[in-house]
Amino acid sequence: FNSIRIDGSEESLTAVRNILTKENDFVRYANANGHRDYSPERNKITFSNVLCPPSEIWEEYFMPSGFSNDPEIAKMYNNTDTNWYEWNSEHWGTKWDACESRIEGDPAEGSLTIYFETAWSPVSTEFLDAFAEILNIANVTSAVYHYEEEQGWGGEMGWDKDLDQQYFRQIDEWDIPDSHADYELRGLDCVCTYMDDFKYDDCPNVESAGE
């Protein structure tokens, strides 16, 4: 689970939203050649609008990855840095484009929040650096990136124009919760609330766990 809250003027937020949701040449190439539909609907994003695979590798990018069921194809393309799996993992930090993405909020009210899912990891520093350039150009005020893996570990990174930041900086990070207190501290329901056979030592009524 990922979210990026962006604060700024109506003009700056509208500019960022338009950049994230536009149909670019990479998307048009993908669609024209019968590949996965990369066209984002309104208020949906594609990572390629922030950090796009260079046009000279597009043909190789969309060829089968090393995970092909054909052994010869797998051998041919495995461990190359130009197929979609390797390029995305290296540059975006995750193997897929933004999943289940949406943008909520009204630029006129001074804030937008971008929601999206990634495969097992947050987006890369390289991706965030490219996104920070967009924020600078659009003259956005600030942004906070929140990421959390389904097991519970995660973190937050921030960018603030008033601090003359060029890049996102780490604000907070946390490990997988390992106690009832950890869950409460983060405002989450402990696993003991939905798993009768699992309790931490500090869970309420832990004495009754084995009865």
PLM region descriptions:
Residues 1-211:
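Intrinsic low-complexity, intrinsically disordered or marginally ordered coil/linker segments
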